[in-house]
A protein has these predicted regions:
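N-terminal phosphate-binding or glycine-rich loops at protein starts, especially the Walker A/P-loop
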Residues: 3-49
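Short Gly/Thr/Asp-enriched flexible loops that form oxyanion-binding sites at enzyme active sites
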Residues: 23-27, 108-121, 181
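Short, acidic/small-residue loops that bind anionic groups at enzyme active sites
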Residues: 117-140, 194-198, 251
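Conserved small/polar residues in nucleotide/adenosyl-binding loops
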Residues: 326-333
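Accessory alpha-helical/coil subdomains and C-terminal extensions
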Residues: 103-105, 115, 143-246, 250
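C-terminal active-site/capping subdomain that shapes the small-molecule cofactor and substrate pocket
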Residues: 246, 252-324
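Glycine-rich oxoanion-binding loops at beta->alpha junctions
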Residues: 48-103, 109, 141-148, 152
Length: 337
């Protein structure tokens, strides 16, 4: 017999992502419509351990769907990964009668969700990260907004770069996953895209590409560099010294996490939030909501965390950039040894 859920909690954990508020709103409204009570856990797993719990109703999520960030606040919590921290969290859940939990975050957040499920709290995860780096899903809450924010900023930088006939290096977020860099590189028409999954450190190839472009009459050269490669300022100095072309680095930073979520992030996050409540009501636990091959589905969290994900060769190749393509082939050669 499925466990009857009467009170659910919702928390956001790890890095914030635009669309978390629409997801929270959907969780609260769907749960209340099904006759459930909802508790909001502030500051992620820190708040769960420290009993920072609030009652939530439809009024508490009014006027938040268009807001960036998370009204529940978020944090990373090392204590929760300890046995003592998990014990405290379980006691807080018991105190408030929380028998179901929706966790919005990334891989680390889902490992925490597994611990809650082990403690007897039915738990459902929603993929909330701007990095698009969760292997089981083609969509993560916040990516669409983040990549559009970055694209618009790069368009503006490109305007001034062309006016001054500069080379510009734009560093975007993505420590281990280069999806923002890849998508912006294609959407902004960059000459080079440097991805953690692909780049082999060959700056000379980039320099040669810049010089070749200038000989052909190009008035600018745009390089999109993922955070995982970094060192954009030093790279700019070296490129300018080698080419004699004025080169500037811009690090977009945390602006990519902020801002009003796009229509897609509002819509998909809302569907995922509602889906999570449906799973809890059905007695499901330790599941991760995903969007795969055009459908909203759910996976066992253990299975989802064991999956791997890599940059699509097709998406990478349609950019038609010789330097970037060289990096791709080098990566594939190394992988096949």
């Amino acid at each position: 017999m499925a466990k009857e859920i009467k009170t659910i909690g919702v928390l956001t954990s790890g890095g914030d992502a635009p669309g978390m508020n629409p997801a929270i709103r959907a969780v609260v409204r769907t749960a209340i419509n099904k006759g459930l009570k909802v508790k909001g856990i502030q500051k992620g797993y820190n708040g769960l351990i420290n009993d920072e719990i609030i009652d939530m109703d439809k009024k508490s999520v009014s006027d938040i769907i268009q807001r960036g960030g998370t009204v529940l606040y978020t944090a990373r919590c090392l204590e929760f990964m300890t046995e003592e921290g998990q014990k405290k969290a379980a006691e807080v859940c018991k105190k408030h009668g929380i028998d179901g939990m929706v966790v919005i975050g990334g891989d680390g957040s889902f490992r925490g969700a597994q611990k809650l499920a082990d403690a007897g709290v039915n738990t459902i995860g929603l993929p909330g990260t701007i990095d698009l780096d969760i292997a089981c899903t083609d969509y993560t809450i916040g990516f669409d907004t983040a990549v559009n924010t970055a694209m618009q900023a790069i368009d503006k930088i490109r305007d001034t770069s062309t006016s001054h006939e500069r080379c510009s290096i734009i560093e975007v977020m993505g420590r281990n996953a280069g999806y923002i860099a890849l998508w912006c590189g294609i959407a902004n028409g960059a000459e080079d895209i440097l991805l953690p999954e692909r780049y082999n450190g060959d700056e000379q190839a980039i320099i040669n590409h810049i010089i070749d472009g200038r000989k052909k009459g190009k008035k600018h050269h745009l390089i999109i560099n993922a955070e995982g490669i970094g060192h954009s300022t030093g790279m700019a100095r070296r490129i300018e010294a080698a080419t004699g072309i004025e080169t500037r680095a811009t690090i977009l930073g945390y602006m990519q996490r902020g801002g009003s979520p796009t229509c897609k992030d509002r819509m998909y996050a809302s569907i995922m939030g509602s889906y999570a409540v449906d799973l809890l009501v059905a007695g499901k636990s330790n599941r991760l909501v995903a969007y795969k091959n055009g459908k909203f589905v759910d996976y066992d969290i253990d299975e989802a965390l064991a999956m791997t994900k890599d940059i699509s060769e097709y998406e990478f190749n349609i950019s038609s950039m010789p330097v970037s393509y060289t990096h791709l082939r080098a990566h594939e050669t190394r992988s096949n040894l």
